[in-house]
Amino acid sequence: MKRFISLLLFLFTLITSNAASYSGTLPVMHIQTKNNAPIVSKEDYLEATYYIDALGISGYQNVGSATTPLSMEIKGRGNWTWRGFDKKPYRIKLSDKQPLLGMNKSKHFALLAHADDNKGFMRNAVGFELSRMIGMKWTPEVRPIEVILNGDYIGLYFLTETIRVDKDRVNIVEQEDEETDADKITGGWLVEIDNYDDSPNIKITEGCGEEIIFTYKTPEILSVQQEQFLTQEMTRLNTLIYGDKHSDELWQYVDIDALARFYIVQEIVDNYESFHGSCYFYRELGENEKWTFGPVWDFGSAFFYSKAQYIYQGREHHMTWIGEICKFPRFMEHVKKIWNNFYDSQFSAIFNFTSNQLTLLSKAASSDAQRWPKYGNANLSKRISKVNDLLRTS
C-alpha cells in the first residue's frame, strides 16, 4: 500500500510538473545546459546558453533569441534554500555583460527561487524596497521572471543583482588577493557576518564568549598581512561594542548612520536572522575610512514575528552584536531620529509597493504554485494582505 501511495504521489507530481506553464505576464528566461546536464553543484559551474523573451511587455527588451542564444555558466547557490527544496536557486555568470531587464550591465546575477517564502514572495521584495526607501547606499535590483530550464518550466524566479565590489554595486576600491602592502590593505573589504563555516573566513570570540564568523568576499584569498589586519579590525570592533556604552569611540570606526538605517529595515520586517547571517559590511580604502553596514540581502527569516519585542531579544539566533549596540544611547537616538522622519514622510508608500507587486505577480504565482504545489503562493492576495498587516504593526 505504501508503495502504491508513493507511486500515486510521484505520478501526480510528474503530471503537475508537465502541465504547468509560464503565465505570459512576465519575461521568460530560457536556459539550456550543455548536454542537458542537471545542475547539482554549488561549487562547479556548468556551461549553458540562455535567452530572455520579454513577450512584448512594456519596459523590457529581449536578450538573445531562440535561434541566437547567448553563452553563460550556471551553478547552484544558497544554503538551506539549496538543500531543503526541489525548486532550487541558482547563480549565473554571463559570458558578456548584459543589462538584463533594465538593470545595470553585469555578468553576475542570481536566480532566487524563494521556495521558502510563504508570504507572497514579499520577504525579500519588501526588505529590498524598504532599503531603497530609507536611503541605503546601494540595494540590489530585482526583476521577477519565469524560467524554463532544459525545456522544463521551473516557475517564478527573481533575477537579482548579486553583492560584489563593482562601480554599480558596492562601489569601493577592489583590494587584490594576497596583498601585502600595508597601505593597500586598509580598505577594499567586503565582509559577511555568517552563520555557516563552509567558506574562507576568520573567527573571533565575542564579549559574551560566543564565536562569530566573518566570511570575506573581497579579497577572496588573504595574505598573512591581510588576515592579521582583518582579525585586528574585527577584534577592535568587538571590544568597543562590548565596552563603554557612553563612549563615542566605536563611531570612529563604524558608520553610525548606515548601521541605523540597516537596523531599522531589519526591525520593520522582523528579520530575526539579520545580524547572524547574510549580514554584509564593507570598508573603503583609506586610513580613516569606516566600516559601513549593508547592503541588505537575505530576508528569508522575515515576518515570522517572534514573541520578542525586538529582533535581538529573540532566542532563535545568536545576535549579540546588535543587542550590545542598541545599548549605546547615541545609536538609539540616531535610530529614533531616522525612524520618526521615515515613518512620517515615506513609510506609507510601502503599501503602494505591495499592491503593485500583487498585480504584477498574481498570474505568475499561480503558475508557480501549479508547478510546485508543496510550497507555492497560489492565494497571493491573502498572503500579501497578511504582510501588510504585519507591516502596520511594525
Describe the residue ranges of each PLM region.
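Conserved NTP-binding catalytic cores of kinases and kinase-like/nucleotidyltransferase enzymes
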Residues: 20-126
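Hydrophobic h-region of N-terminal signal peptides that target proteins for export
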Residues: 6-18
